[in-house]
Amino acid sequence: MLYRPFGSTGLTLSALGFGCGSIGGLMVRGAYPDMRKTVARAIELGVTYFDTASMYGVGQSEVNLGAVLRELGQEPNSDIIVGTKVRLKTDEMTHIEHAITTSVEASLRRLGRESVDLIQYHNRIGPNRTAADPEANLDDLAQIVQTFEKLKKAGKVRFWGITALGETDALHAAVDQGGFHSIQSAFNLLNPSAARPVAADFPYQNYDGLINRAAARGMGVIAIRVLAGGALSGASERHPVAAPSVNPIASAPTYETDVQQARAFQFLIDEGVVENLVEAAIRFVISHEAVSTALVGTSNLEQLELAATYAGRGPLPEEVLGRL
């Protein structure tokens, strides 16, 4: 397993992170013995970062991850780094500190921990606070950071970050304002714009080098949607435990279109560079040195084993990257 520094936190993360969300689905809808077996194997393979959220399975992912880690003897302050997230509703934006504190304390109870290594703000960033899924503006972020700082003083969190989804200009402004330790950013073969220049007529959201900007400011970078919700497998079929449908982020309007677009990378298989598109997707993301960890959700042990194998093969050759 490869390891990367997590920004300026002093933490070191495995290049492959273990996603506990609904898309892969294992930690939300899987059988508990399968969860335990897969998490245990991930730790054996050198995975050190596990990412969950209060909204995954309405808290069930946190409950399951916490129970498995305790059963495996992985207590806080071990080499295992746990991150979770807080998401606010529209009516909670008027009392941010109270809402975040309440949410974090509930997450800690579900995880069965007194503290969490990384807490992340899970709402979009932008000017619209009246939407059903309210965005946070720069003033909100300043208050959110102050709340996280208080939670750190109370011994409930160690570090904090944001999920960098929303308007591109607002995301860059948030990174420039700073005050947090990390970002999660969509970055994959279908939309590499968070790290690489794209054409003026690029059809999807252009993140305009966001993760480069964050890394330059000492922030850790967690790449999300590494497999575009599974579309970068090149197959439409979903595992029974996985989310039955996926809403694309910063790529095509539909999952099926993403699957079709993924097949454009078939040449990497034909040339013997990779075994399959999943390998191409994972190795592409970890080829970018600003990425601290590539977050991949799994549905079963086999998928985890393959993801770890592919991550262990390291970045794609420079010559290949130049053609992508």
Q: Over which residues does each language-model region extend?
A:
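N-terminal binding-site loop/beta-alpha segment at the start of enzyme catalytic domains
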Residues: 1-80, 188
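Conserved, mostly hydrophobic/aromatic
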Residues: 6, 18, 42, 50, ...
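Short, well-ordered coil/turn segments that N-cap beta-strands
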Residues: 11-16, 46-48, 74-80, 112-117, ...
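Active-site mouth loops of central-metabolism enzymes
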Residues: 21-33, 86-99, 133
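Short, acidic/polar
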Residues: 29-42, 95-110, 166-174, 281
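Alpha-helix-loop-beta-strand connector modules within alpha/beta enzyme cores
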Residues: 62-84, 140-155
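Active-site groove signature of glycoside hydrolases
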Residues: 108-134
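Beta/alpha (TIM)-barrel catalytic core signal, keyed to glycine-rich beta->alpha loops juxtaposed to Asp/Glu
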Residues: 124-324
